[in-house]
Amino acid sequence: MKQHIKNLPIILASSSLTRVELLDRIKIIPAQIIPADIDETPNLRELPAPLAIRLAYGKAIKVASQIEKSSIIIAADTVAAVGRRILPKATTYEEVKHCIKMVSGRRHRVYTGLCIIKKENNQLTFRQKIVQTIIKFKKLSDEEINFYSSLDEGIDKAGGCKISGYAEAFISFISGSYSNIMGLPLFETVNALTSLGFRYSDNTANVCKDLSTKSMVQNHFGKPSIS
């Protein structure tokens, strides 16, 4: 009889509550959350897609170097851009306003670099993917720009807007993965996990019902985050 091999524990190399919630949608709860503190400054003339995958790789490999036990590490980085121009992860209301003005009435792209590492017996196996979604905003009035830039939701978001928030009212067109815009392309994530031997059916049957794991996630963010 073929021996059944249990899933390796999943580690999320991110401090993003949204990514935790996205994984929960597909019934995956990380065993650990280990944010990777890396320099996210773009290199000179670096393009959006290469930046996203470079940062995702950097996060994954840093966390992989910090752990000893066999695990699967999921890391991602999301970059928004108008053409070749990378939009910042807004940290101020003025940056939010700048980003919203840039995308008003135009198509822009959201890239998420995905890097998943299977660490087993000190051997690393990689799966990497860059996913692109195209978004078009309607032409925004000054009133709409000023109103949105006064909200908190664009702060700390790639491109200065939260697509699943009020900004959704501005979208006239989306081509590609919606979960990619939010920070983690779920289709590609599941495909990569499966290719690394992760048994999705085992995870939904067992891991997602572990209340202690859910409590760990909630405690990490200081409030309940999994519904």
From Swiss-Prot:
GO cellular component annotations of the record: cytoplasm
Residue numbers annotated as active site: 77 (proton acceptor)
InterPro entries, sorted: ITPase-like_fam, Maf-like
EC number annotated for this UniProt entry: 3.6.1.9
Catalysed reactions, semicolon-separated: a ribonucleoside 5'-triphosphate + H2O = a ribonucleoside 5'-phosphate + diphosphate + H(+); a 2'-deoxyribonucleoside 5'-triphosphate + H2O = a 2'-deoxyribonucleoside 5'-phosphate + diphosphate + H(+)
SUPFAM superfamilies listed in its UniProt record: ITPase-like
Alphabetically ordered keywords of this record: Cytoplasm, Hydrolase, Nucleotide metabolism
Top-level division of the source organism's lineage: Bacteria
Location within or outside the cell: Cytoplasm
Required cofactor names: a divalent metal cation
Cytoplasm is among the record's keywords: yes
An annotated GO BP: nucleotide metabolic process
GO function terms (MF aspect): nucleoside triphosphate diphosphatase activity
Physiological role: Nucleoside triphosphate pyrophosphatase. May have a dual role in cell division arrest and in preventing the incorporation of modified nucleotides into cellular nucleic acids.
PANTHER family linked: BIFUNCTIONAL DTTP/UTP PYROPHOSPHATASE/METHYLTRANSFERASE PROTEIN-RELATED, BIFUNCTIONAL DTTP_UTP PYROPHOSPHATASE_METHYLTRANSFERASE PROTEIN-RELATED
Family, per entry: Belongs to the Maf family.
Protein's UniProt name: Nucleoside triphosphate pyrophosphatase
